Amino acid sequence: MANTTITWLGHASFLFVTPEGKRIVLDPWYEGNPSFPESAKAELEHVDAILLTHGHMDHTGNAITLAQQTKAPVAGIVELIGWVQGQGVDATQCIGFNKGGCIELAGIKATLTTAHHSSSISSGSISLYLGDPCGFILEFSDGCVVYHTGDTCVHGDMALMGEIYQPNVTILPIGDFYTMGPRQAAHALKLIGSKFAIPEHYGTFPALHGNPEALQSELNKLQLNTAIVALQPGEAWTYPA
């Protein structure tokens, strides 16, 4: 069996391929996503599970369409998944759980974690609340443990996630403005203690000005040797490097 493979689909979208060949997409957004590589569209023709961190359209943009096309289960916090079902996704596909809860799907364990952000979707002039924003701990059969922090600022619970799950890969936003930037992200990595870090949620729009070089500079200030895996949209990385 191959090891876990992680492909960045631009902005905050990721495709995970498990050692068993299962395909899991997180926060799918490709229509209107300026950083989504069109060559990756074929990668989403078949998926085995869909994970959602929160309700903002740059994270749920194509979740409904993809769920209806692939019949894959969709997992996330209860209120968000209730909205997914309300959009026409079959109830048998919908897995709404809550922070601290762990489920098994597509051959992995997925645990919802705390994130500090907001979560809503606009309906005309009204914003619909879609539950708390979250991150995920993803545990794969080859020993790869991914902590996807979700959209967030740095927070103290990250140290607990590091202690409990000992993730070896952290995926975290660095763009600033709507999430933490490089300075806070470096402190997040200090709390978590993972060997590898994959930056995301940067460069899509001018406001998201954080970049991997700035993250490296901040890590140097903290004397951390976390290895930054700076993927290009559409690029895959296999654990362990």
From Swiss-Prot:
Which superkingdom is the protein from? Bacteria
Q: Name one GO molecular function term.
A: hydrolase activity
Q: Which controlled-vocabulary keywords does the entry list?
A: Hydrolase
Q: Which Pfam families match?
A: Lactamase_B_2
Similarity comment: Belongs to the UPF0173 family.
Protein name (Swiss-Prot/TrEMBL) = UPF0173 metal-dependent hydrolase Haur_4333
